Amino acid sequence: MFSGSDTMLTAHKRRVLAKAVLCAALALAAWTLSPGAGLAQDRQPNIVLIVADDAGYADLGSFGSEISTPNIDALASVGVRFTQFSVSATCSPSRSMMLTGTDSHIAGLGNMAEFMAPNQKGKPGYEGYLNDRVVTVSTLLKDAGYNTYMAGKWHMGEEPRHWPVARGFTRDQTLIPGGGSHLEDMWGLKGERQLYTLNGKAVQTLRPGFHSSEDYSSAIINNIEENRTDGKPFFAYLAFQAPHDPFQLPSEWLNKYRGRYDRGYDVIRAERIERMKRLGILAPDSTVYPRLSNVPAWSALSDEARRKSARQMELYAAMVEHMDANIGKLIEYLKAKSLYDNTLIIFLSDNGPEGNAWNVGSPWDNSRFEDWGKKGTFIQYGAAWAQVSAGPFRLFKGFVSEGGIRAPLIVAGHGTRGSGRISNAVAHVMDIPATILSAAGVPHPGTYNGNNVAPSQGKSLAPVLDNSLVSVRGPSDWLGWELFGNRAIRQDKWKLLWLCEPHGAGNWQLYDLDADPGETNDLSSAQPKVREQLLAHWAEYAASNNVVLPDSSPTCAKAN
């Protein structure tokens, strides 16, 4: 994120905004300099960072879903929900920014390692792993005396020198690659054996009855308990695989949502959007991106197609609730051990829902409908239900439209004031490290181990969390995105979006996100000065972050 003067404004508006920005700056300075503001006072807080994998913006009860998520919703009821929080369009770029506060094109994940284009390979920022030009929040907290624990999905480098223990975590139970089975078979997408580590060592087997959501949450609890009386605060990073496909569940969860989605995706999506409006997550007149042209109306499907589609969503919903139950297990533990009140808890999703279908083969076997959701099956839900998960937004994971990059963020506990608040502040995943370090009273250094490291590009959300300010960004601040050749710039309410064909127009389009969160009305012709201003910001973003547009892309008919 970079800032600049907003030349789109009239002279009078600039003078008015200058006064407003000055007042905000003075308030922020006063907040920053006041004794203990946003920082640890007598005791440094514990910090829990919880990440859902591929959960959509509209998949939580507190964001309008019919899926039962009582534990996440309880955090929302005592904390702050952010309605305009953005991430990258896929997992590893988001995670690199979430742990470093630095743009993914600097941190080494300018593209996912799996989709690195030939012209990107070997370029700085495109290593395909978390590089040494950045320092992780876990490293800084560890050096500041924190116990640091991780459990779950890593996806930021597969060599031992890239594993969590090399990036500041003292204990871990980790799936190193980007996905695979949730069960003990350790299968990857093509049935290959996936790499897991335990405290920095590769493991050969997982326990019988292993399930990712249950075992990762238990690992965090066990690590906290083992060192609970040593006097140190802890940073716990719980990186769920759920609800990422394949949808697999313990037997008692398989029929949790049986029959709940028989009315189909058109009805469920409309109901979610209405609930979002009632909750204040969406404005009453918010636009909605229409059902994708390649998705038939539910009423047009055959009975068999409806049966299968509804079952896919039943399993997905159960995955979300099962994850929530295991979050509840952790929160219950924190309360039972009198740790909850001094803990900052952050929950987010790493990107939009997965609407792209994977081609999987042997040994995965989906031939028996009654076995769906069990070991050996790889169930996905496709674009239609992904649109339900994304709510009113356009597209889903893999795209820098709002459906791919708008994610739920809930922050509760230490340093938050005003139970159940909804914040419309523009926030970004790069803000997470700055917020954590502010809470812990730990500065971000310019050097580490004698080497220069990239500065944090995020902003601490602490002034919003403690209700000192409504936003940490002014009208001249802007944010940039690029992934797979798709690109975007956002400044205040304006977003300039390039989506390649066949999913987009293959040129720049301008949207007013306040009036049009569904990105349905291109205002490029009506607002040429705004368009040119944001194009200039795009050029600055690309140059400052060493963006290399790919010559091949998994989402584009033709790249660049």
Language-model features and meaning:
Residues 5-24, 31:
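Bacterial N-terminal signal peptides that target proteins for export
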Residues 9, 38-41:
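Intrinsic low-complexity/disordered segments
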Residues 28-37:
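C-terminal segment of classical bacterial N-terminal signal peptides
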Residues 21-25, 40-508, 515-543, 547-560:
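Formylglycine-dependent sulfatase
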